[in-house]
Amino acid sequence: MAASVDPLVVGRVIGDVLDMFIPTANMSVYFGPKHITNGCEIKPSTAVNPPKVNISGHSDELYTLVMTDPDAPSPSEPNMREWVHWIVVDIPGGTNPSRGKEILPYMEPRPPVGIHRYILVLFRQNSPVGLMVQQPPSRANFSTRMFAGHFDLGLPVATVYFNAQKEPASRRR
């Protein structure tokens, strides 16, 4: 059997956070001029503001975007898995998260120790969910799978992840 070269499998996004899925939508993510590709490294200082996210699709389709860190507080002991950084629902296709309803405001990456994975997951909604979704009581111990199941979102339609680690104090500004 050949080894998988899918970066979501190699990076353990499939398994730790998501089940295997077939991408059916396009999502492009940028922090400033930096285009995010699976497994790339981003300095936390470049991710202070929410990324620019463009979603393909038709305006009559609605999407949910979730961003989590499955490595909180540390990759070797992720006992807060997953730490949720952002939730936006009811995003019209062909637009971006600013057109949706923000359930949980964006929180920039703050990896305390080790290399953390930050995962942006896009789901296609069957109907509007904005009135049903509440802000989680805590950012810790969120489950993307349980969230998707609770709101009948099914499998993701697109996902991208990046890595980040704590920057030396002299570089943070």
Swiss-Prot record:
It is found in: Cytoplasm. Disulfide bonds: none annotated. It comes from the Eukaryota. InterPro entries: PEBP, PEBP-like_sf, PEBP_euk, Phosphatidylethanolamine-bd_CS. Gene3D superfamilies: PEBP-like. The modification N-acetylalanine is found at residue 2. Disruption phenotype: No visible phenotype under normal growth conditions, but mutant seeds show hypersensitivity to ABA during seed germination. Expressed in gametophytes and developing seeds. GO terms for biological process: abscisic acid-activated signaling pathway; positive regulation of seed germination; response to abscisic acid. Pfam families: PBP. Keywords: Abscisic acid signaling pathway, Acetylation, Cytoplasm. Induction: By abscisic acid. GO terms for cellular component: cytoplasm; nucleus. Transmembrane segments: none annotated. Belongs to the phosphatidylethanolamine-binding protein family. May form complexes with phosphorylated ligands by interfering with kinases and their effectors. Regulates seed germination via the abscisic acid (ABA) and gibberellic acid (GA)signaling pathways. During seed germination, MFT expression is directly repressed by ABI3 or promoted by ABI5 in the ABA signaling pathway. Involved in a negative feedback regulation of ABA signaling. Promotes embryo growth by direct repression of ABI5. In the GA signaling pathway, MFT expression is promoted by the DELLA protein RGL2 during seed germination. This is Protein MOTHER of FT and TFL1. It comes from Arabidopsis thaliana (Mouse-ear cress). The gene is MFT.
